[in-house]
Amino acid sequence: MRLVNLMTLTIPALALSGSGLAAQQAEKIEITEWDVPWEESRPRDPYVAPDGKVWFVGQRGHYVAWLDRETGEFKKFPLDEGTGPHNLVVGDDGTVFYAGNLVRHIGTLDPESGEVEKFWMPDEAARDPHTLVFGGNDDLWFTVQGGNFVGHFVPASGDVHLVKAPEAGSGRGSSSRPYGIKMDSKNHPWIALFNTNKIATVDPETMTLTTFDLPDERARPRRLVVDSNDVVWYVDYSLGRLGRLDPRTGEVEEWVNPSGSESRPYAMAIDRSDRIWFVETGVRPNKFVGFDPTTEEFFSVTEIASGAGSVRHMFYEEDTNSIWFGSDANTIGQAKLPPPRPRTTTDH
């Protein structure tokens, strides 16, 4: 394990915009949901494998499973009782990587045999691996929410390096709660520190963690995405906002969500047109929202038929221009997006 120094960058004053959307003008999208056959298992964090199967975890049911979208067939691979899998990703060879959130490991699952191999965290304090993302060098980066780390995992060697995140002085202990994580084009991970008003990144060469302070101390970024210009977009769960952070200038701009300050935006994705999508979980039913950075407008709001309860994480499938999600209503869903639009690129 390597512990590193922390750097902090100061962000200029916040620019806050209104929602820019009238309810009657909102564009609707088609959402299909499949009922998961294992009741109250909290299916979540789907990921589409190279063969088209939709893999997901059952956080409360302690399993990994897949859905065949064409036939509606499900297949379950039970994990050890008490594993609490929180998230998964699938490699190019079909290998499934899952976060054993309650048992301090990252596991791999062979999609044919169901055989599991476990890679343990090198520090017992890293008790709850949370969200995984592939890097660009046959590696993975991940968050450890309660344990307060950002991690780097090399499957070929089994090596795990942990970077300590900053301490926080508010709510749910001292952990800054590293939560959502995504990669930029330079293979740097970006992390939402959910118990703070900070967004972090790690230099993969030095393993130094740098934080960006968001201007509103009440902000609580939960999930984020990185666009084609390496601009970071995040949802502020506490204040009901969508935010944009430009790491080159430190400029922050935010928009009030269509459902307002109590919208509780959670799961997030970005499509190949750089349009931003997220789910408002503070309203019933949950609402699937689209934002166009070009016009700076929320252009799409669609209610999720099951109600959803909460949608926690999403996966964009470029081949079908759709987003996959799991819901607390015990469903796996597919949101079919409007046709892609040209995106604007910036030299940097």
Q: Language-model features: where?
A:
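Beta-rich, blade/repeat-based domains predominating
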Residues: E39-P50, E81-D93, E124-D139, A168-K186, ...
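Blade-level signature of beta-propeller repeat domains, shared across WD40, Kelch, NHL, RCC1
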Residues: G309-H348
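A short helix->beta-strand "capping" segment at the edge of beta-propeller domains
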Residues: Q24-E40
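Conserved beta-strand positions in repeat-built beta-propeller and related beta-rich domains
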Residues: V54-R60, V96-R104, L140-G146, P189-N195, ...
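Beta-propeller fold detector
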Residues: T32-D35, K75-D80, E117-M121, H161-E167, ...
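A short loop-to-beta-strand structural motif that recurs across blades of beta-propeller domains
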Residues: Y63-W66, R104-T108, N148-H152, K198-A200, ...
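Bacterial N-terminal signal peptides
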Residues: M7-S17
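Short loop/turn segments that connect beta-strands within beta-propeller blades
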Residues: D68-G72, D110-G114, V154-G158, D203-M207, ...
